[in-house]
Amino acid sequence: MQLKRVSIVISQLLCIFSFSQAVNSCEDKTFWQTWYQGGQFKGFGISPTKEAVAKAQYLFAENHYKGNLLTKDYKRALDLFKKAADAGLLQAYFRLGLMNHYGQGKSKDLKSAYTYYEHAAKTNNPEAQFNLGLMNRYGIGTKKNLYTAFDWFTKSANSQTILNQNKCTKIMKGVVEAQFNLAQMNHYALGTEKNIFEAAKWYEIAAAHNMKEAQFNLAQLFFTGEGVDYDIDRAIENYLLAAKQGLAEAQLNLAQIYHYGPSHLQNYQKAHQWYLEAANQDVKEAYFNLGLMAQYGRGVHQNYVSAKHYYLQSASPKIPESYLNLGFIYHYGLGTPVNNDKAFEYFDKAASQGIHQAEYHLGIHYRDGRGVTKNNDIANYWFKKAKAKDLKEKDYINDSFAFREPDDVDLYVK
């Protein structure tokens, strides 16, 4: 009776999912789908093969795992994947790896996940190989080993022949994330010698698959000329691709090229547009530059109120020029009433970060008693400190607003 019940279940499975009895199962568009060869089941009294049972278990498990046609049930899926794996179906090991990795249907077990991924990798499963690469790169579920990570990323990044549960072969393209990681490993000498040429090759391959991080890093190489020929046009092309996908670093760099770049590339309207996009992701540098554009009327009408708003958004120890410019706004009453207390506060913050113009104007406030008790000794201290920068007097007396030169050209997505 047990044998008959198993046969009935498998037969019902065929009916439920309306499987064709294809002459050549390898032609199926859904490569991992389970197929049953014509003539395999001849009646309820015929015992299904161990392989057929494993395939049925795998199919049931997949549908419980994804919630397709069957109720989503991780615990049931886990049990069936285990049975299929125990019966020798290697494809089940990858799912077991994922379920242990992310705690689906059971508690998270990274060591077991690693072991299951290793079994799955024997079938040239590129996703399993990629996960093994990540786990070795970051020491997840195993000891950190960059050399092993590099090997797994190399396998996963390249096209390879894989075998499904019906022993059909298929060429699988490399995993894009593995291609990006392989580029990084070559770029930063992780598990291999530094090779910018190889890094650029793999960034370009991943970028062709529309991976924004790869597009950005490729743009950086072209922009800096690191390991490749300097090519500002290709840099802009790749920044633009990444920026349109919402990568804040690309939006900022693209804006800075249009803002500060060579005259034939300057376009204040485009710069303003991309600064706004980056600012919407709370990029402080973008806020600061929007303040400058509002202050000087570049790409927009001059507006001190808007400038102050953006400087307040960007003000931080990492961008002390914002403090200086706010100091000037309150010192001279630009778009707001003169406020010596506020001016002193912001000059003091900028001076604490070594901004020489702020040091000089802090001296003025102490000398004249603006926003602070008059104190000539402290005033002279700040005047001397500003002059000690060995700058020409016009540099630190000049009341011009501070510009912040683009300083993120060496920033790569890691």
Report each predicted region and the residues it spans:
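Classical Sec-dependent N-terminal signal peptides that target proteins to the secretory pathway
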Residues: 1-25
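Short helix-capping/linker turns of helical repeat alpha-solenoids
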Residues: 39, 45, 50-53, 57, ...
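Hydrophobic face of amphipathic alpha-helices that form TPR/SEL1-like repeat modules
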Residues: 57-66, 80, 95-102, 131-138, ...
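Ankyrin-repeat and related helical/solenoid repeat scaffolds used for protein-protein interactions
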Residues: 321-385
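Terminal, low-structured helical/coil segments at or just beyond the last alpha-helical repeat
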Residues: 373-374, 378-414
